[in-house]
Amino acid sequence: MKNAFLKTQLLPLRPLDESGSQWLKDITEQARKENLESLVSSLSNQGKQINFLNAVMTLSPFLREVLIANPSYLSPLLYVDIETRLSEIIEDITLIDKNKSIHETTLMAALRRKKREAHVLIALADLGGVFTYEISCAWLTRLGEAALGVALRFLLREAHDHGKINLSNREDPEKDCGLIILGMGKFGAGELNYSSDIDLIVFIDEMSPHVGNLSESIDVFSKMVRRLIRIIQERTAEGYVFRLDFRLRPDPGSTPLALPVRTALRYYEGRGQNWERAAMIKARPVAGDKSAGFNFLKELFPYVWRKYLDYAAIADIHSIKRQIHAYKNYDQISAYGHNIKLGRGGIREIEFFVQTQQLIAGGRFPQLRGRQTVAMLAELHRLGWISEKTRDSLVKSYAFLRNVEHRIQMLADEQTHILPIDVSQFTSVAYLMGYQETNSFICDLLKTLQVVEKHYAALFENEQELGLEIGNLVFTGEEDDPETLITLRRLGFERASDICRIMRTLHCGRYKSTQSAEARERLTELTPALLKAFGATKRADEVMLRFDSFLQGLPSGIQLFSLLQSNPSLLDMLVLIMGAAPRLAEIITHKPHVFDGMLDPTIFSELPTKTYLKNRLEYFLEGVISYEEILDHLRVFADEQRFLIGIRILNGAITGKKAGFAFTALADLIIAKTFATVQEEFSRLHGNIKGGRVGILGMGKLGSCELTAGSDVDLILLYEHDEDAEISDGGKPLYIFQYYTRLTQRLVAALSTLTSQGILYAVDLRLRPLGNKGPVAVSFEFFRKYYRKEAWIWEHLALTRARGIAGDLDFLQKLENEVYEIIAFSRNKKDVIKAVCEMHVLIGKGKPPENRWDLKRMPGGIMHLEFIAQFALITHVIVFQIGATTADILTQLPNSFLNQSFISDLHHAYGLYTNLSQIIRLCLNDALDLNNMPPGLSDLLLSSVGEPDLLRVEKLIEETGQLVYSIFKQVMKY
């Protein structure tokens, strides 16, 4: 027969200070109030047991507080051993629901009282050396199961009585109820630690005859689980029973608390992650329909235990290691503040050492399918997988670390695994471990951590590392790994917990891009490089959020992840897009197909000339015949090529001027092909006009080959026909004016209508004769007459940028010849100056600059450069050429017009503005705001102009604007 606990030889503990005697007096006083005379007498005696209690009171604030309030917990220990008393408590718990008058409030109170007593007794037995850590864990697990069981039985009976479910046996409500509760982690393994959460997953056996309508059952059982959480977890005046955690269930962010078995099986077989396989090793039915629970685990068997170790399985297992791996050069093992569970050399590494080898060999060796860590170490040795020395050192280390873990938690009954930084609290842990001074404890602790780390590091010593020794990157389960948070902050992330959540979501397979195991494997391998690259940006969290949005829209991720893994330069480019260019990031988020163009190895070596783009377009449209398909293909092609031109700008492969040529060449091709397609379809329906010819003039920046990303296109559609023509010759004939009006409208719709494949170009027809008051399609005769007799000078200025881009080639030549003749008119220079100045004032009032970075409308900005260039053309300072850019015109200005220094200044200003505006228009949808600038955009802008900071750039822009404006006023004598 075992001795009563308070008469047993207990481990001598060193007290923290001399306060223990006073605390014992407080217990004695409370015991006297409760008439516990035997206990009062015992506490008054001197002896090793009293000295033990004295020390405990100084070392554990939690135990001290509970014992002072509840000295009755000690009374039975005068007569019985702790295990006997614990058995009585467990029995009391299991019988609570037998009381027919029980209700939720009394159940909660009874559970909390019984649990608190058991909790204290287990701690005393553990600290006194009566229990090993294994026995303590077993009792804690039994306590958890008893509490869960009685609470669930109460809820099942209540639901049955209210007609929500139909039990087969009210007296034994768990039997065949169809509700499965699996204990996971340490609870499933029977290794619950002192202040542990209990990890649970709840399933519904939809095949059970007692589960009715599945949708209703999900609702009923999920509500039942919420009440179970309240009964067990909610803190009341009596405390709490256990904290419950249901986040290990499949896709916890989007699934109910109670999940149908078939749904779960589909998830595990199709989207189950590496860590979920490992987690299921310890899964065990702990409450509810246990028979159905064991059947579920049998069905899950092939997912967890793979019979043949193929390459995919090995990669899967390696992926777990990569997700949990603590890199060798990251930090140092320490004592104060070290995480005993998740830190280097900690409990998690021992558990992973075992679980990895279980996953590798458990499919072939049934002996390796056990749940308990120490037992599996023994089996690994027995099968020859590890040496006797490895087994013994890891068993010893595991015991030591579990004991340390328990004592950390006994300080304040908190689920923490971190050794205190506070010297007094750290000393308390050392003394609770039985040490008489801290140095010996620290020495043994560090030695243990180093032993574990050594075995863990050797687990896959020949495996290729991920290549970046940057620290812990653990994104398994639902908890944030403390060392991972440290790593993320070190990399440059401010909201490390949010980044962990994003990475867990990616690894969970909730997005299409990460649903396949192969994609998640590639992502795991890419993660260190990805996070390092994003962390190096100025606002890493914002960049990571954009990347997350991008992946949400990606239909498949494996190709992208593989591409980024094998092409670091592409990863750098993706990071640059996410960090500097919200507009491009938005494009690839909604149209991820544009990123396909990055597969082209010549992307940065070949400039996007018109010939280059024409060849690409012909190849892209090969075999595409129908009207809608051609338009959709054009939209996809335009999106991709605009994106790739933008990438070349970001990369520095092309200047702003060359980008203008490239964007314009693309627009020319797209508009010409769109018009040809529209015209063919229109002719099929309505026929043709006799002698009819159409030509389209590009105006504005399209005409002068200076388009930017996102530019509108200014167009004028002109036509001519035979004099005797009246109506088209098709099945649905139209009169001439109606015909060309509708043709123009069809063209505008084809270019500017937003479809699922995007939009080609926003179209502006306002530069046509009479603007919005005039017809959308203009006859050549009216055009000729208008510009020769009625047009304002500003319309002649605009005509200097006219260029034929689509339609009948002979007619386009005729149109351009007419433009040459109109520009060649003799004009009064003073009238032109007056018109330019009036327009300048009008624009300044109607559309003033938004800020200092409004490079177009600011004083001395792009608009003033264009005024100077257009003025020089229509006053014949230089010879007019169709398609000449503003830069070309400024370069050709003669010294008789401006001195060479001014001409050079204008040309330099245009280059500065063009480079900056191309980048800004590429990266942003809205005007640039220095207070809300994307993190990487400032670096791009600085790089483009060679300045060290944005204040210098602003100063440069301001000085350049002042210079240009002064030249403008000199030219206009204004």
Curated annotation (Swiss-Prot):
Lineage summary: Bacteria, Pseudomonadati, Pseudomonadota, Alphaproteobacteria, Hyphomicrobiales
Protein name, per record: Bifunctional glutamine synthetase adenylyltransferase/adenylyl-removing enzyme
Similarity comment: family membership: Belongs to the GlnE family.
Annotated region (Adenylyl transferase), positions in chain: 468-974
Keyword Nucleotide-binding: yes
EC id: 2.7.7.89, 2.7.7.42
Recorded superkingdom: Bacteria
Primary enzyme class: transferase
Pfam families reported in the protein's UniProt record: GlnD_UR_UTase, GlnE
Classification via InterPro entries: GlnE, GlnE_rpt_dom, NT_sf, PII_UdlTrfase/GS_AdlTrfase
A Gene Ontology BP annotation from the UniProt entry: regulation of glutamine family amino acid metabolic process
One Gene Ontology molecular-function label: [glutamine synthetase]-adenylyl-L-tyrosine phosphorylase activity
Alphabetical keyword list: ATP-binding, Magnesium, Multifunctional enzyme, Nucleotide-binding, Nucleotidyltransferase, Transferase
Role of this protein: Involved in the regulation of glutamine synthetase GlnA, a key enzyme in the process to assimilate ammonia. When cellular nitrogen levels are high, the C-terminal adenylyl transferase (AT) inactivates GlnA by covalent transfer of an adenylyl group from ATP to specific tyrosine residue of GlnA, thus reducing its activity. Conversely, when nitrogen levels are low, the N-terminal adenylyl removase (AR) activates GlnA by removing the adenylyl group by phosphorolysis, increasing its activity.
Entry keyword Zinc: no
Organism of derivation: Bartonella henselae (strain ATCC 49882 / DSM 28221 / CCUG 30454 / Houston 1)
